[in-house]
UniProtKB/Swiss-Prot annotation:
Self-association and partners: Part of the KICSTOR complex composed of KPTN, ITFG2, KICS2 and SZT2. SZT2 probably serves as a link between the other three proteins in the KICSTOR complex and may mediate the direct interaction with the GATOR complex via GATOR1. The KICSTOR complex interacts directly with the GATOR1 complex and most probably indirectly with the GATOR2 complex in an amino acid-independent manner.
Protein name, as recorded: KICSTOR complex protein ITFG2
Major subcellular site: membrane
FG-GAP repeats: 19-48, 125-154
CC annotations in GO: cytosol; Golgi apparatus; KICSTOR complex; lysosomal membrane; nucleoplasm
This protein's record includes keyword Phosphoprotein: yes
Keywords from the UniProt entry: Lysosome, Membrane, Phosphoprotein, Repeat
Amino acid sequence: MRSVSYVQRVALDFSGSLFPHAICLGDVDNDALNELVVGDTSGKLSVYKNDDSRPWLTCMCQGMLTCVGVGDVCNKGKNLVVAVSAEGWLHLFDLTPTKALDASGHHETLGEEQRPVFKQHIPANTKVMLISDIDGDGCYELVVGYTDRVVRAFRWEELAEGPEHLAGQLVSLKKWMLEGQVDSLSVTPGPLGVPELVVSQPGCAYAVLLCTWNKDTGSPPASEEATGDSRETPAARDVVLHQTSGRIHNKNVSTHLIGNIRQGHNPEGGNAGLFALCTLDGTLKLMQEADKLLWSVQVDHQLFALEKLDVTGNGLEEVVACAWDGQTYIIDHNRTVVRFQVDENIRAFCAGQYACKEGRNSPCLVYVTFNQKIYVYWEVQLERMESTNLLKLLEAEPEYHRLLQELRVDPEDLPAVCTLLHQTLYHPDQPLQCTPSSFQDPT
C-alpha cells in the first residue's frame, strides 16, 4: 500500500453543523459544470461554485436538513436541488440563474433569500436520499431511507401541463421494511442489465428492493397522499437480503454501499454491475452480481463514507472510502490500494466531479472538518494505481533500448543499468564509467 499526497486544495467557509448525507456534488444551475451543495441543521442550504470560499447562493429550508441531492426529479429535463429535513419537509429549488450577478459572481438578491419552487411534507425521520431510475422505465424516482429501517419510493406526478411552473406532487410508490438500519441507497445493474435498488444492512450485508409496481394492475393514484401510511403495505417478499461471504466480527456494524461502479469496456463482465461495501470496523469489499466477491480488504480505520471516482482517467471508477480521522483509501478493481491522509478529523465526505478551476469538471475529494472549513482537493488524478519504478517505466519505451545500445550497455546487465541511471540522474557532469564486458571490443 503506497501513500500519495494531493496539494491542490481550496478552503470553503462553512460554520454550521450537518448530517453525513447533507452534502453532494451536482449541476445545480444546468450549465454542465458541477457545484457543491451543503445543508446544515439550521435549515440553511449553501451552494458553492468554483473556488470561491463564500457560497454562490443560499436558501432557507424548514427543519434540520438531513439529506440533499441534485437531479431531474420531476423528469422535465432540468436538474433541481432536493433538500429534505428530519421533520419530513421536502423542498425543490430551481437554481438556474435568472437574476443579475455582481462582479464576484454572487446573486444580487438584496436580502431576498432563494425560495423553493415546491414544498411537500413526507414521513419524518429521513436519513438518506437517492434520485435515480430504479425501475428501468427511463424516468427518475426519489427514494428516501428513514431512521426506523423503512425505505420509501416516490415519483413526481403532474397535475397540469406547464413547463415553467411545477404543478404536481410526489406520490408514494412503495414502502419497504428492512431488518436493520439503512445507511446507504444505491442503484446497480442486475444480471440482465435492469437497474436494481440496493440498500446497505448492518454486518457488511445488503438487500435488493424489488420494484413491483410495474407488475401491478395500476399505478398509485395521484390523489394518494405521500404522507399516508394506510395504503402502504410493506411486503417481506419484496426485500431480498444478501450476506456477503467472509467472516464478520460484528454483525451489527454500520455498513455503507455504493453501486453502479463503472468498469469501462469489459466484455467478460457482461451486464452485471459492480458495487462496493465498507463497514465502520474497516472492512472493504467489491462485489459483482449478488454473491460474487471480487476482493476484500481490511484496514485499521473506521470507515464512515464510501464513494466512487475515476482517478486514473481510464474509464474505470475506483472505490474511495474515508475514515473519521481523515485517512482516505482509493482501491481499484485489481485490489491495488492507495491511501491519502487529511490532517484533520472529518465529519462528512463526498467525492465526484466538481468545477473548481479552469472552467471544467475534474475529480475532487471533499472533506467537511470540525474547524468551520470545507476542503476541496481538486484535480485528484494518478497516472497509475499500481506501484512501479523507473526501470519498469523505461522498459516500456522503445527509445530506451536504442540509447543503451549506443552507450554500449547490456539491457540485461541490471547492475550496469542501475549505475548508468544513478550517474545520469545525480552526476550528469561526470564522464560515463559504465562499459560492461559483454559489449567490449575483444581486440
